Amino acid sequence: MSLSNSLGLLGRKVGMMRLFTDDGDAVPVTVVDVSNNRVTQVKTQENDGYVSLQVTFGSRKASRVTKPEAGHLAKAGVEAGEIIREFRVTPEVAGKYAAGAAVPVADVFAVGQKVDVQGTSIGKGFAGTIKRHNFGSQRASHGNSRSHNVPGSIGMAQDPGRVFPGKKMTGHLGDVTVTTQNLDVVRIDEARQLLLIKGAVPGSKGGFVTVRPAVKAQASKGAN
């Protein structure tokens, strides 16, 4: 669920490109497909104890949907999607939608708005401390043999005689949920339901992302 009482959209990362301003400046943008967002359930304070909108995105074969989920979607009259997420909203926002209703991009976002984009970062596999934790290499010579890229000492003395939990070491890198905050919406293509967001967003091409109004939106430069 979102961290604020704001409706967001689910989408798929299409890729990156650049736009040019009237002054000729190049602006790198990520294209996010947010088409066919639809409401699967409207939760209310009376029935559920809180107010939210449950939204799905994409399409999925009927054979890949569990029976409980199929019944839930059939009740809403909605085609099965690839992902389902829930957004906490105000009662006023929830009152604008009913189960089965589409959520167009223009209802949620506007050009110039700050957004937070959440996705799954690209998996890098097993990585060393230099790549994983930005460690520096050891000396290339002067007596250093076969220890150029190792982390070095990881332990303590006889007391406590153990490696503390959380020690930065080698291990799996990437493939975790990441949120990039305060990105600008540069352009909205309402016909194709595309969001063009300034900068990079987490994940690989084709990965699912969740776009929300920024929780900690930064004030513009020059503001008091």
UniProtKB/Swiss-Prot annotation:
Belongs to the universal ribosomal protein uL3 family. One of the primary rRNA binding proteins, it binds directly near the 3'-end of the 23S rRNA, where it nucleates assembly of the 50S subunit. SUPFAM superfamilies: Translation proteins (SSF50447). Gene3D superfamilies: 3.30.160.810, Translation factors. One of its GO terms (cellular component) is cytosolic large ribosomal subunit. InterPro entries: Ribosomal_uL3, Ribosomal_uL3_bac/org-type, Ribosomal_uL3_CS, Transl_B-barrel_sf. The keyword Nucleotide-binding does not apply. One of its GO terms (biological process) is translation. It comes from the Bacteria. It comes from Acidovorax ebreus (strain TPSY) (Diaphorobacter sp. (strain TPSY)). Keywords: Methylation, Ribonucleoprotein, Ribosomal protein, RNA-binding, rRNA-binding. The modification N5-methylglutamine is found at Q158. This is Large ribosomal subunit protein uL3. Pfam families: Ribosomal_L3. Part of the 50S ribosomal subunit. Forms a cluster with proteins L14 and L19. PANTHER family: 50S RIBOSOMAL PROTEIN L3, LARGE RIBOSOMAL SUBUNIT PROTEIN UL3C. Methylated by PrmB. One of its GO terms (molecular function) is rRNA binding.
